[in-house]
């Protein structure tokens, strides 16, 4: 079988692999970064992924505390740096570094690389009181990293429409990406965010795109959504996860996923060996919206939008 890879084009003209197959958060997240918490398993998964064909998209973040593992894997691979797309995030809510610039300098040192391909503000919750700079000032810091070449692209994560509007008022460089929770059961993390990003040429990245399968029970098999995904899985001879991930990309969204199983990592990197029709994409969208909203993260803050957001 021939290998197919697809890319999204960002608003600055740069290309980004259309799926991130190694997310180093979620299952790999840890509360401290020590020799005792070092995960050889994560290193093995990254090294395995880096042996696959194509440009490999790895998603990291300050808050995950997995820089040592990413750095170790990068030191072991024979894949050239320009065949690796590395995303990192400054996490203001945990105050591990003084600013985006400080955070990135620490990250680059720990990962043993001179630059990241994408650097994100992990949340909009930046304040003078906690971080010593406002959201707008944090974005200006991000722009300097972009201009210096330490970050080839810059963006945000978990931003609502009003947060992006604040950034856009002062931006010399528009965010290239907004990484949010997105799945068939949560098609707007906050009201109107998917449409707003599309209208402003900001690529949406989806974390937890497979939430519906993660939380699926035996009783769910008879629900219309899962019945239809199974039908498509049998039609295309693909896993149900591949069907959902392909739906995500057909919505113009970049899925961020990961697995400890080599076959699933390979399946994700080979996602573009098949396609869904427009009708199939629309039906998954409709059946997903009919299902009760499923939010895995930020429930305290954004849970109030669960039903209203899906109607936008």
Swiss-Prot record:
It is an enzyme of class 1 (oxidoreductase). GO terms for cellular component: cytoplasm; cytosol; nucleus; plasma membrane. PROSITE patterns: ALDOKETO_REDUCTASE_2 (PS00062). The active site is at 64 (proton donor), 122 (proton donor). Transmembrane segments: none annotated. It is found in: Cytoplasm; Nucleus. Keywords: Cytoplasm, NADP, Nucleus, Oxidoreductase, Phosphoprotein. The N-terminus is blocked. NADPH binds at residues 25-27, 59, 157, 179, 208, 210, 257-261, 264. It holds the Pfam family Aldo_ket_red. Thermostable up to 40 degrees Celsius. Stable from pH 6 to 9.5. The keyword Ubl conjugation does not apply. Its EC number is 1.2.1.-. One of its GO terms (molecular function) is alpha-keto amide reductase activity. The record marks 89 as: Lowers pKa of active site Tyr. GO terms for biological process: cellular response to oxidative stress; ketone metabolic process. Present with 4030 molecules/cell in log phase SD medium. Belongs to the aldo/keto reductase family. Reduces aromatic alpha-keto amides, aliphatic and aromatic alpha-keto esters, but not beta-keto esters. Monomer. This is NADPH-dependent alpha-keto amide reductase.
């Amino acid at each position: 079988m021939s290998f197919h890879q697809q890319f999204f084009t960002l608003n600055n003209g740069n290309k980004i692999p259309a799926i991130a197959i190694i997310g180093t958060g979620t299952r790999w997240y840890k509360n401290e970064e020590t020799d005792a918490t070092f995960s050889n398993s994560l290193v093995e998964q990254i090294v395995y992924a880096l042996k696959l064909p194509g440009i490999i998209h790895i998603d990291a973040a300050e808050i995950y505390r997995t820089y040592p593992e990413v750095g170790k894997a990068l030191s072991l691979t024979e894949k050239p740096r320009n065949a690796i797309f590395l995303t990192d995030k400054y996490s203001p809510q945990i105050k591990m570094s003084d600013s985006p610039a400080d955070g990135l300098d620490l990250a680059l040192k720990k990962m043993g690389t001179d630059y990241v391909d994408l650097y994100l503000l992990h949340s909009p919750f930046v304040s003078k009181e906690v971080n010593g700079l406002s959201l707008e000032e944090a974005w200006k810091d991000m722009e300097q990293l972009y201009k210096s070449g330490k970050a080839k692209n810059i963006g945000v994560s978990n931003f609502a429409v009003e947060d992006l509007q604040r950034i856009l008022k002062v931006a010399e460089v528009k965010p290239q990406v907004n990484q949010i929770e997105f799945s068939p059961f949560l098609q707007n993390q906050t009201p109107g965010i998917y449409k707003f990003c599309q209208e402003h040429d900001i690529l949406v990245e989806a974390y937890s795109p497979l939430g519906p399968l993660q939380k699926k029970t035996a009783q769910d098999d008879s629900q219309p959504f899962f019945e239809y995904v199974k039908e498509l899985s049998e039609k295309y001879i693909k896993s149900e996860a591949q069907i959902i991930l392909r739906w995500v990309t057909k919505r113009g969204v970049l899925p961020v996923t990961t697995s400890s199983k080599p076959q699933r990592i390979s399946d994700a990197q080979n996602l573009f060996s098949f396609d869904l029709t427009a009708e199939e994409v629309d039906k998954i969208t409709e059946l997903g919206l009919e299902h009760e909203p499923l939010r895995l993260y930020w429930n305290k803050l954004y849970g109030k939008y669960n039903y209203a957001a899906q109607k936008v």
